[in-house]
Design a protein with these regions (language model features):
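Hydrophobic transmembrane architecture of multi-pass small-molecule transporters
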Residues: 110-203, 209, 214-218
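Transmembrane core module of solute transporters
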Residues: 1-106, 206-218
């Protein structure tokens, strides 16, 4: 999201940080609440809620255009942050629920490593898709920008290099926005595809008098 805001919306770095910061606040609040609920309710239900809330935020982002108000960016970010908070905490609790205490240090290292690897792969895939789709959509849009297009010739002087440069900039912006929307759509589908996998997650109920499971987070 920050690269999109800076490259397409022209947001300064400081403004980008301000409009995306509420997402982190939503995550923090959700993690505090989720930490209190772990051990008191089925973690699968918490994970389900987290994934569905995240999917709602991504669905809203699929409607992004080049004309966005800051509230259009802030609220989906807050919703997504809340969803992620309800995913991270229960997921960590499930990971360490059946792990022997003497193995938790090693388990924390492996868990953090795998999560970082997964995040890196996900970011790389999304960035590659954005770059590729931008080029594909750009080529598709340019096909219709030729002297045979009467509406284009009527409104623009295609013999002017300045006009051609301006048109190319406009097409690139539109292509980039479509590519980002397609990326949000891909993440939306991936989030929904994860939901059925919750059926194989084992939920360990806390016995009477047993302390709530410790949650290891970075």
């Amino acid at each position: 999201l920050p690269p999109m805001l800076e490259a397409l919306m022209g947001y300064p770095v400081a403004t980008t940080g301000l409009v995306t910061a509420p997402s982190g606040v939503g995550t923090m609040v959700a993690m505090l609440i989720a930490g209190r609920l772990v051990g008191r309710m089925d973690v699968r239900m918490m994970l389900l809620a987290g994934f569905l809330v995240s999917a709602v935020a991504l669905y809203q982002m699929m409607g992004y255009t080049l004309v966005l108000s800051q509230s259009d960016i802030v609220w989906p970010g807050v919703i997504q942050g809340v969803g992620l908070g309800f995913v991270f905490v229960p997921l960590s609790a499930v990971t360490f629920a059946t792990l022997a205490p003497e193995l938790r240090a090693d388990g924390t290292a492996i868990f953090s490593l795998m999560r970082n690897i997964g995040s890196s792969i996900g970011i790389s895939v999304i960035q590659a898709q954005v770059t590729r789709n931008t080029q594909v959509v750009h080529a598709s849009l340019v096909e219709h920008m030729n002297p045979a297009n009467a509406a284009l010739v009527q409104n623009y002087d295609l013999s002017s290099p300045t006009t051609l440069e301006s048109l190319n900039r406009m097409v690139t912006q539109q292509a980039s926005m479509i590519a980002y929307v397609d990326a949000f759509k891909l993440m939306f589908i991936a989030t929904l595809c994860v939901v059925p996998l919750l059926a194989i997650v084992r939920s360990r109920r806390r016995a009477a008098g047993e302390d709530a499971p410790h949650v290891a987070m970075d």
